[in-house]
Regions:
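N-terminal beta-strand/alpha-helix entry module and adjacent surface
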Residues: 1-106, 111-199, 209
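Conserved small/polar residues in nucleotide/adenosyl-binding loops
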Residues: 206-213
């Protein structure tokens, strides 16, 4: 049985294990975010920003990837993304619009037809652009179906042999009492059921938030 700390405002269910996660820090990615980075496309190389939050329980850090933001018009040089002001500006606008209650927890790089292996150049890019101690890197080759998470361990990025996919309840229906509607012309009453649909809002549990990063934009 997988042991997960249930945080307030989060409904995790139907957790699926990918690979063989060893003991230590854990990575959880929401099914919709996982599906998004695997969407079929003609693009040979893609980059995503992971939004979510982190938690710590008894010294074990858990990274929750709740959403994946595609980075549009990313420039590449020898399969390495060239992060610049233009790319980050688009990302920050999307964060400000839709993800102010989350933080950046890492990123993903998909290079079709190339083994998803960490190189010194990629690690340098990660350290420069994603310096957080618990920000993860997800390398993919969607053509061959290979993928690996990397996280900080000591002073290096180390591969994680497995991770977890969880399914968050995004919408649920609440039944409220029938509403009586007066029909003045006929002088009769009609009972109509009304359904209220609520959206579940993600909650971040860290003191760093994306909207604080964007305060000066």
């Amino acid at each position: 049985m997988i042991d997960i700390a249930e945080g307030p405002g989060r409904d995790l269910k139907n957790i699926r294990q990918i690979g063989t996660p060893a003991e230590g820090d854990r990575i959880y990615i929401e099914n919709a975010a996982y599906a998004r980075v695997h969407e079929e496309t003609y693009e040979e190389r893609r980059v995503f920003i992971f939004m979510g939050h982190t938690e710590c329980e008894q010294g074990v850090y858990m990274t929750f990837v709740e959403a994946a933001i595609p980075v549009r018009d990313m420039e590449f040089s020898q399969n390495l993304p060239r992060w610049g002001t233009h790319a980050w500006s688009d990302v920050f606008r999307e964060i400000k619009r839709s993800y102010e209650n989350s933080i950046i927890v890492g990123w993903a790089l998909d290079c079709k037809g190339y083994p998803p292996r960490l190189t010194a150049e990629l690690e340098a890019i990660h350290r420069e652009q994603f310096g957080g101690a618990h920000q993860v890197l997800f390398l993919m080759d969607s053509m061959e179906g290979e993928e690996y998470f990397y996280l900080h361990k000591g002073n290096r990025l180390q591969p994680k042999n497995g991770f977890y996919i969880y399914y968050a309840r995004e919408l649920h229906e609440i039944r409220i009492p029938d509403v009586t509607i007066e029909l003045p012309r006929r002088g009769t009453r009609q009972m109509l059921p009304e359904i209220l649909t609520e959206s579940k809002k993600a909650v971040s549990y860290t003191h760093l938030r994306a909207h604080e990063t964007l305060a000066n934009l």
